[in-house]
């Protein structure tokens, strides 16, 4: 049946994403969403375009989250960071999770990614903040808390460093584009 074929494709794409060294957290979320959608379909027309959308979503997943070019230590560090991004994440915690010393992690991370651990963390947090600011009306301080930065002034300063505008100005620009 069409459902069985799509469920098989979903499983194959999931396996390919694992081979591309994408964190299981991301893979399983996409896999589960497609499985629920396929299994919940009542009519054949409910499944139109699902195969194409699956290919697109899994390709984007690999494109944005593949860690295939990194050593296992850096993969472990990035996976830990991504899983704890909205908490107070310290270099010591990350190094412990990867089973290496702080100095080794810092040097290796910089060598393999081209940025420091904190630059990576802050970049990811600012990316999340941009999403919140673009689609919600949350107060700026709350957005900062949501991304793991409890100090509103520090959040604004960091956001301005990365985006060349304040969070409030960014939100206004995004609202003007709607």
Residue ranges and their predicted role:
Residues 1-87, 96-97, 172-178:
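Inter-domain helical "communication" segments and dimerization helices
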Residues 9, 112, 129:
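DNA major-groove recognition helices of helix-turn-helix
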Residues 55-62, 102, 106, 128-129:
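Juxtamembrane/interfacial segments around transmembrane helices
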Residues 85-86, 133-137:
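Short amphipathic helical patch at the helix-1/turn junction of helix-turn-helix
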Residues 88-124, 138, 144-169:
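Basic/polar phosphate-binding segments, predominantly the helix-turn-helix DNA-binding elements
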Residues 121-130, 169-178:
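Short, basic, alpha-helical segments at the C-terminal edge of helix-turn-helix-like DNA-binding modules
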């Amino acid at each position: 049946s069409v459902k069985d074929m799509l469920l098989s494709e979903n499983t194959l794409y999931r396996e390919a994403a694992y081979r591309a060294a994408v964190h299981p957290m991301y893979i399983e979320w996409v896999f589960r969403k497609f499985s629920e959608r396929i299994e919940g379909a009542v009519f054949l027309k409910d499944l139109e375009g699902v195969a194409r959308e699956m290919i697109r979503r899994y390709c984007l997943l690999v494109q944005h989250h593949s860690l295939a070019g990194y050593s296992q230590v850096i993969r472990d560090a990035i996976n830990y960071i991504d899983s704890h991004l909205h908490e107070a994440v310290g270099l010591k915690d990350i190094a412990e999770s990867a089973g290496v010393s702080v100095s080794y992690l810092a040097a290796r991370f910089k060598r393999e990614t081209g940025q420091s651990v904190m630059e990576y963390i802050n970049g990811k947090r600012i990316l999340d903040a941009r999403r919140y600011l673009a689609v919600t009306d949350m107060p700026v301080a709350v957005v900062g808390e949501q991304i793991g930065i409890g100090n509103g002034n520090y959040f604004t300063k960091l956001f301005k460093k990365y985006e060349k505008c304040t969070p409030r100005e960014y939100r206004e620009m995004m609202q003007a584009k709607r």
